[in-house]
């Protein structure tokens, strides 16, 4: 029993990046009660850090509202064979770097589904960012003007899941389309991407410029 407790203390210290002196001292001089207290304190600290990490991920994601899959109606949703409802709700697609296009008319819950999937990803420790396409293009243009575009691209590259809402709602000019294309290219096979759109695929060329 004591050996198991000592091993658990060492594991906690490694995960918390604490000195190995703590488990050594506990093992050599601590009583069973003291070891039990230290293990509980370490486990509480790990739990608190995990809670704070999830809160930080949620805040950094930039969701416009809080949505979950609780009570979500799949009545108008058709999932492809490669994606199960469980994969969607448990963020299994993020682990596989799978991309999702949520297509359909306004008002059927595309944004709700995207946010719910993103929030679930955050609770599992995945770094996530949410933007409308217009918002992201404007931000990319601003950062380029300020000379900090590469910093933003680096931040976007570090994400596990990138959600782009309202794909195709507003045409994007040529400069904006080039910036947006670079973000999409950076995401290829390195993270998951969710797009919500009411525009059929054959008309996606109109997203980028009015004259295409």
Regions found by a protein language model. Give the residues of each.
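Interdomain "pre-motor" coupling segment immediately N-terminal to P-loop NTPase/helicase cores
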Residues: 10-65
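Conserved hydrophobic/aromatic pocket- or pore-lining residues that grip, position, or stack substrates
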Residues: 72, 114, 132
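Walker A/P-loop nucleotide-binding motif
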Residues: 97-113
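Conserved post-Walker A coupling segment in P-loop NTPases
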Residues: 97-101, 117-140
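Residue-level preference for the first positions of well-ordered beta-strands
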Residues: 99-101, 161, 194
């Amino acid at each position: 029993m004591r050996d198991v407790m000592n091993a658990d203390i060492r594991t906690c210290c490694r995960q918390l990046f604490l000195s190995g002196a703590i488990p050594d001292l506990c093992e050599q001089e601590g009583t069973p009660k003291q070891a039990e207290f230290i293990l509980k304190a370490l486990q509480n600290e790990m739990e608190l850090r995990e809670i704070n990490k999830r809160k930080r991920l949620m805040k950094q994601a930039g969701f416009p509202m809080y949505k979950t899959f609780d009570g979500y109606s799949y009545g108008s949703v058709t999932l492809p064979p490669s994606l199960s409802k469980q994969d969607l709700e448990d963020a299994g697609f993020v682990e596989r770097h799978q991309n999702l296009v949520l297509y359909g008319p306004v008002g059927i819950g595309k944004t709700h589904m995207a946010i719910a999937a993103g929030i679930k990803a955050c609770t599992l420790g995945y770094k996530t960012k949410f933007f409308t396409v217009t918002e992201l293009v404007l931000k990319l243009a601003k950062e380029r003007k300020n000379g900090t575009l590469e910093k933003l691209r680096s931040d976007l590259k570090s994400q596990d899941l990138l959600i782009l809402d309202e794909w195709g709602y507003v045409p994007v000019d040529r400069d904006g389309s080039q910036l947006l294309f670079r973000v999409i290219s950076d995401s290829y096979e390195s993270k998951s991407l969710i797009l919500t759109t009411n525009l059929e695929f054959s008309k996606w060329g109109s997203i980028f410029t009015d004259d295409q």
